[in-house]
Amino acid sequence: MNIEKFTTKFQQALQEAQSLAIGKDNQFIEPVHLLTALLNQQGGSTAPILTASGANLPLLRNELNAELSKLPQVSGSGGDVQVSRSLVNLLNLCDKLAQQRQDKFISSELFLLAALEDKTLGDVLKKCGVKKENLQQAIEKVRGGQNVNDPNAEESRQALEKYTIDLTARAESGKLDPVIGRDEEIRRAIQVLQRRTKNNPVLIGEPGVGKTAIVEGLAQRIVNGEVPEGLKNKRVLSLDMGALIAGAKYRGEFEERLKAVLNELSKEEGRVILFIDEIHTMVGAGKTDGAMDAGNLLKPSLARGELHCVGATTLDEYRQYIEKDAALERRFQKVFVGEPTVEDTIAILRGLKERYEIHHHVQITDPAIVAAATLSHRYVSDRQLPDKAIDLIDEAASSIRMEIDSKPQPLDRLERRIIQLKLEQQALQKEDDDASRKRLAMLEKELGEKEREYAELEDVWKAEKAALSGTQHIKAELDSAKTQMEQARRASDFAKMSELQYGVIPALEKQLAQAESAEGKEMTLLRYRVTDEEIAEVLSRATGIPVAKMMEGEKEKLLRMEEELHKRVIGQHEAIEAVSNAIRRSRAGLSDPNRPIGSFLFLGPTGVGKTELCKTLANFLFDDENAMVRIDMSEFMEKHSVSRLVGAPPGYVGYEEGGYLTEAVRRRPYSVILLDEVEKAHHDVFNILLQVLDDGRLTDGQGRTVDFRNTVVIMTSNLGSHLIQENSTLDYPSMKELVMSVVGQHFRPEFINRIDETVVFHPLGKENIREIATIQLARLIKRMESHGYQLHFTDACLDFIGEVGYDPVYGARPLKRAIQQEIENPLAQQILSGKLLPNQLVTIDYVDGKVIANQ
């Protein structure tokens, strides 16, 4: 018996049969070993053939195991097994059957026909319901009238089952999400599919607009019979490129698989529509030196109209891959899929709502759906509807589900805090100094309070979780009943349809209403409804933009914004008021949604608080004064440096890195942008800023649009500072007019015209400097406290520092130098020499022209 005459699959099965015999301590490889190996073979055709011929596979497996257990076992044979006489006879019979069929290689399905001639196996197969006529029909169907002329012939069989996913079968079983709207695009696709030749639509659109959903909608329409006669009873198969490429080790294997798929499709004679998602992957797939890629293999079938194909790809990839291949492009008809409007998105979300409710076991309210569509459209600019809105709904529902399944956040926070306190308690118990004992007493008091609070909350949580009954189980049953009703309607099974429509479904709906009314009681810890607030929270977490409803505390904070900013910025009432009003307009939802929150030009002499106000604003909004995009415009003095802001153009070094300004805003869409010393930049930089100030958008070097609508743009400049110094006694409007005449000479009118407000900063007086000295000395007190020293400054000392630090030309900056020289330097010397001891009050006074420290 020449083993080379067997197909690859048959050879693998023989090896498995040998392993099975060795494992069972059998001396001979019997036919029962080989049939068991064939039945368990991955990707083999034996199991599908037996199923098609009406065999009972579980019974067959049991019978084969029983036969295996009857075989004699020989221990100590050293694993040497031989082929039994009966198996040799069956393999010879297989060879004879192959010659009758004019096959060059012996395939595994012929062994089934030969097995019927064997006494033992023949009895087992007949007992399991296998008849010779049925088996022969099943084999012929699998072979498809082809001879076995290749050792890999078995692997290319049933290519459609192996390498495609049946979307119509999934639609029949209700596994596809409902497709709402998109009638125009589906109608256009159907129109192209009905052509005589070149009947291949390709859906082109941005990622996330619903191209794949359109094909799923087409499959659902075919199943429901809502298509023209030419498309009725057709199957929509989705080509699985991963399965097609996976495991294709040798050259030509991928092409062989694809050719097998195309051959089977041509045999279907137009009854199958092949859907290729990401069709651009076909161009270049399997391409090696001298080999054809998949795109070229498709061309003849597409041109002749043998292959009904629907493709889907994005605009960029269509241009990059398919438009370059003009011969492939002309075989497809383009169907553009645009982004749906907010209203269409709301309709789509309402259709999907039930599926997401069943999956997450939560309830999604209508305001949440409206909020997901409107908020994602406004605040997520780099993605498309409906995908970004669906993501918001999905994530919000997931977070609610996570809360129900796991400990609620208040409980979790308390538990972590208790663990933290216990660890601290253990560490402090080992210390014996006064400070540690004091801290331990405070800590134990806090620990007791937290543990009591935790116990109370845990009881509430358990009670609420028990109250949430099984509405989701009823919802899943209801969804299943509706799917069954659709299947009954398609099969014209009116008895089952009426039973479901008038019996089962109304009963389930009644149960659901009762369960939901029981759940409707107010809950304190657990939430099971997704509302617009949850959607806003998810969006805020993802983008950093505060769109969630303002808490009372935040409202009060915004109303007292000037007061908060004045704690760090002394004087400059006009500037603080202008910035505060812009932030309040934005948070109240009154600002223009197509412009930045506010754009300001701060003018004034050096050291009066222009940059400090930006830092204070960033600290107010984000609790971190470094949370702002600070760009020193003095770095952009040359014309070519403009590209650093938006990124280098294609072909230049650094193209992939993106721009300094655009990348920072893409990562943090809600931020304060400080353009410091703006007058020092090249004039071309201002041309870039025109779009930012007017439309709140900027296109970077890679062609991506960056959204600036949630930023506060602040530019600082020293222009006209000499006029401010010289005319400090003038009233604010007159001074502003004077300074604006200088600004108008430096900046272009179109730039000045786009700025929301130009604010002139006043020079600082002596009383302002004294207040700033108080703020800066308070920071020094805080720094010293961390080292164990308690400082106190007398009024005389404050007056002296204010006097020394005052300079009408340089503003508040000399004050820092005065504090260093007059206070910090002597303090450092006294601490290092041991004259000042920790944990005691140090009074710093100004006596007889000297700053002295007393303890």
Swiss-Prot record:
Question: Could you tell me which residues belong to the region Repeat 1?
Answer: 6-71
Q: Which PROSITE patterns match?
A: CLP_R (PS51903), CLPAB_1 (PS00870), CLPAB_2 (PS00871)
Q: Which positions does UniProt annotate for ATP 2 binding?
A: G604, P605, T606, G607, V608, G609, K610, T611
The ranges of region (NBD1) come to 158-339
Domain Clp R positions: 3-145
Locate the region NBD2. 554-763
Statement: the UniProt record of this protein carries the keyword Coiled coil: yes
Which GO BP annotation is one of this protein's? protein refolding
Chief subcellular site?
A: cytoplasm
Instruction: Tell me the segments the record calls region C-terminal.
Output: 764-855
- Name the InterPro entries on file: AAA+_ATPase (IPR003593), ATPase_AAA_core (IPR003959), Chaperonin_ClpB (IPR017730), Clp_ATPase_C (IPR019489), Clp_N_dom_sf (IPR036628), Clp_R_dom (IPR004176), ClpA/B (IPR001270), ClpA/B_CS1 (IPR018368)
A molecular function GO annotation: ATP hydrolysis activity
Q: Which GO terms describe its cellular component?
A: cytoplasm
Ranges for region Linker: 340-544
Q: Which residues form a coiled coil?
A: 390-522
Cite the domain annotation text: The Clp repeat (R) domain probably functions as a substrate-discriminating domain, recruiting aggregated proteins to the ClpB hexamer and/or stabilizing bound proteins. The NBD2 domain is responsible for oligomerization, whereas the NBD1 domain stabilizes the hexamer probably in an ATP-dependent manner. The movement of the coiled-coil domain is essential for ClpB ability to rescue proteins from an aggregated state, probably by pulling apart large aggregated proteins, which are bound between the coiled-coils motifs of adjacent ClpB subunits in the functional hexamer.
According to its UniProt record, which protein family does this protein belong to?
Answer: Belongs to the ClpA/ClpB family.
What quaternary structure, including any partners, is listed in this protein's UniProt entry?
Homohexamer. The oligomerization is ATP-dependent.
Q: What is this protein called?
A: Chaperone protein ClpB
Query: Gene encoding it?
Result: clpB
